[in-house]
Amino acid sequence: MESSDIASRIWLIAGPTASGKSAYALDLAERIDGEIVNADSMQIYAGLRVLTAGPSQEETARAPHHLFQIVDPALGWSVGRWLEAATQALAEIQARGKPAIVVGGTGLYFRALTHGLADVPPVPETQREISSLLYAARGETEFREILKPLDPEAEARIESGDRQRLVRAHAVAITTGKSLTAWQTDTKPALAPGSWKGLVLDPPRAELYARCDARLAVMVEQGALDEVRALETRGLDPALPALKAVGYREFAAHLRGETSLDQALDAARQETRRYAKRQLTWFRNQTPDWERIVP
């Protein structure tokens, strides 16, 4: 590839937690003189660098990093806000004539870049509640039969057990008279086709789980408990997105004296593995054409 092509190309590097994607992205950035943009919904928050495996000072000194630890945990964040910030960062990087490397594990961020973000009208809270109650009353199988004539593509696409997305698809169709799939089809991608290359790091399952376990031990050594303790003293709403970071709830329970450290670590290991499995499933289903890399 010519140097001009490398500079203009945007690299999208995705993968499950602990797959080694951050190290891969940093190595690539050093080789091609690129800049890194965060695509992880938890690494966006300040004060959780260790718990979310964000880049260290040594790593940020090796290549420019953008959109890491920029939002206070007391504040919310959304795909739309990330997309706006990311597209601005990408434009600035390319204006400097540098390659841009977007790395993270939040699939919806990558989808927003490559498929666009649907401008769906707000759904009233009352309709969300009605759709949720309908799901609870009828169960998933019958709810899917109700959703199918409203949005057959969404019904077929949404995985079993994904109540939130099923309920949203129903609520959007009822509120707007137009299926969520139709809204999404009408969107334009933020990145032009051909301007980017997608890679998914896909280590063997056993190796990935071993990496997850090892990472948790390192997090404790590097101060993850101190990060959780600092946020707990602020009395933040447990429903805030930042406090849903994998491991936060388990370590917070330990700090409150509800569990031993070993129990907290065991619970965090299980949650980390479940999270990694969900990510693997998402990237397998949503990015089938991206190149797979075995680290």
From Swiss-Prot:
Site positions (Interaction with substrate tRNA) are T106, R128
Q: Which SUPFAM superfamilies match?
A: P-loop containing nucleoside triphosphate hydrolases (SSF52540)
What keywords would UniProt list here? Answer: ATP-binding, Magnesium, Nucleotide-binding, Transferase, tRNA processing
- The record lists substrate as bound by T17, A18, S19, G20, K21, S22
Which cofactors are reported in the record for this sequence? Mg(2+)
Summarize where ATP binds, as residue positions.
G15, P16, T17, A18, S19, G20, K21, S22
Interaction with substrate tRNA: annotated span: 40-43, 164-168
Q: What reaction gets catalysed by this protein?
A: adenosine(37) in tRNA + dimethylallyl diphosphate = N(6)-dimethylallyladenosine(37) in tRNA + diphosphate
Q: According to the UniProt entry, what is the EC number of this protein?
A: 2.5.1.75
Q: Does the keyword Cell membrane apply?
A: no
Q: Name one GO biological process term.
A: tRNA modification
- GO MF: ATP binding; tRNA dimethylallyltransferase activity
Q: Indicate the family of this protein.
A: Belongs to the IPP transferase family.
Known function? Catalyzes the transfer of a dimethylallyl group onto the adenine at position 37 in tRNAs that read codons beginning with uridine, leading to the formation of N6-(dimethylallyl)adenosine (i(6)A).
Complexes and interactors: Monomer.
Name of this chain's protein: tRNA dimethylallyltransferase
Gene that encodes it: miaA
